Amino acid sequence: MLEQARRRLAGLNAKLRHHDMLYHGLDAPEVTDHQYDLLVQEKKRLLDEFPDIRQYDDYADVVGTPKIDSRFPKVQHLEPMLSLENAFTVQDVEKFITRVRRFLELQPDDILELSCELKMDGMSFSALYHGGKLTRVATRGNGHFGEDITTNAMVLRGLPHQLDSAPEVLEVRGEIYMHHEDFEKLRGSCNFANPRNAAAGSIRQLNQKIVEERNLSYVAYSAVNSTFATQQEILKQLDEWGFHTNKQVLFTDKIEEAIAFYNSVYTTRSALGYDIDGVVYKVNSINFQKLLGATGKSPRWAIAHKFPSTEARTKLLDITVQVGRTGVVTPIAELEPINIGGVMVSRASLHNLNEIERKDVRIGDLVIVKRAGEVIPQVVDVDKTLRSSGTQKFVFPSHCPSCGSKLHREPGEVALRCVAELSCKAQALERVKHFVSRDGLNIMGLGAKQIEFFCNHGLIGSIADIFSLEEKLHGINLDTEHGWGEKSVANLIAAIRNSATVRLSNFIFALGIRFIGVGAAKLIAEHYRSYKNWHQAMLALTETHDTVQIRGLGEKSISSLKAFFSVQGNLEVLESLSAKLNILDEASPAQRGSSAISGKTVVFTGTLESMSRTEAKLQAESLGAKVANSVSANTWLLVAGSNPGSKHEKALSLNVRVIDEQTWVKMVEDARS
């Protein structure tokens, strides 16, 4: 179950990255906010149910992704524009109320009033007023920074440009959307999938006249930096200032009334003339809101009760299998394409062999497919009443479809997996992505597309091949390939060279061993201190029935280490890597905490003779220091090599201590002794 959850988490993160890039980076979202939020909600439920997989979460606390190559200036919000936590059932709402009451330490007879408001399916914005005058309008962006769309927002119907008796600084938030009628008029000339996409794309037009012609609407729902006592007062004042507000709102202290409001809205929403995707419940008291605060990405005082997911029936054309990074072999339903909730679906998850057998899924069946925040949709049922005699039972392969290794099922697990790990080509692509990730070797410029390119062209077959790439590229002219140029190739080679010096904990994590996330890798590295010690201990572990004790590490992690070192192909890759990398020793927690530079800011400048800049940086960080790229008043130490440049002059002017490379080496040795 844990491996399934980890695989699901990786898929959810991949999907979230994909949609964040489409929405925030390319202005071309494929899904609605509703569909995106379902992905976020499923991820939250998954992490709540399997807390042990949090260490594998490489896309945490995400609100959005900064827009690339933006045509609009980036601006900062007064306070972060966080996304809302989602509820899909009455039980979810009840749990939210319970959490809020517990957090506020309310007694059973204490009143907790809610504001129940429609959740618009549009694009969030903030409007900033100084002295009552509208000075800036911005998109939500990544929650902290958004795009300045002031010029275009000036033509939004009914958006006040001047407020009477407003606070000196006020930030009003709301949603830009498009009515169905206006969307239908637009559909003939523009290729937008739905009103939400049309609103998001229209407000980002470079031509203000086009924005005005699109007839966009908005609704305001909150005010930041205000002195109001309740959300009810905020909505009333927004209305008096002339903002468009949604009049379909309920204030109640009874959860039954809130749910009844939700049900009423759900059944009558088609008559609204615009899209909504749920009801938002907010704690009405602003004082309570301030006490509740927020998590990394969601306020604790609000939740979005989302409308049910959609299902559809289609034909199962075939069942294929795919091998993931950790070797799990997953069956995939190949479907007759069907439109579910505005998205064309042609593939769906069948989860595992047990699920196929339990549901008696056969090729040729009519299956029920559900989209409810899945990475890919899932097959939830089979319509056996229409089963024909020509359907076929699926035979799950006994060997890996990629490398031919015999598939293995571990006790207590339902997933079949290929245990070849580092030597299985199907796993190579995802393993290389993991290897170069931020918490691994952190190779900038070697992203998913570049890795896929090199794998498809036979230049990378395993993680060790990364460090032979420079040699292989000598005989290849990448300038003729799309997306490559002389500068990008040079930058990639430089990044690979820099990554050849790596801290032991990062190296262990980068290998992608099952159950060894960032935290576990650090525990292992701190226990053995050097690559040589760790390698020898693991080889000894495979030759005995004994086990090892590493503080904080569980049985599954130890067993996984033993299994990893029992595969000859893995040992060969390790031998190749250790010959090409400079794997730095890991400092103990005691060393980091007690070192003279712990918590201090260090800057390096000039050319170092005995080590690379990367190695020096890792040395400093391993001893608890913060490494900065520039000198400031907060800099504690400047390490100057030959030809130090302007940083040296600035350090002297700020009375920052300056030492040479030899003194730095001695300082590191003393800290580690």
Curated annotation (Swiss-Prot):
Broadest EC class assigned to this enzyme: ligase
Annotated catalysed reactions: NAD(+) + (deoxyribonucleotide)n-3'-hydroxyl + 5'-phospho-(deoxyribonucleotide)m = (deoxyribonucleotide)n+m + AMP + beta-nicotinamide D-nucleotide
Keywords for this protein: DNA damage, DNA repair, DNA replication, Ligase, Magnesium, Manganese, Metal-binding, NAD, Zinc
Name of the featured protein: DNA ligase
Organism: Anaplasma marginale (strain Florida)
EC numbers: 6.5.1.2
Superkingdom of this protein's organism: Bacteria
An annotated Gene Ontology molecular function: DNA ligase (NAD+) activity
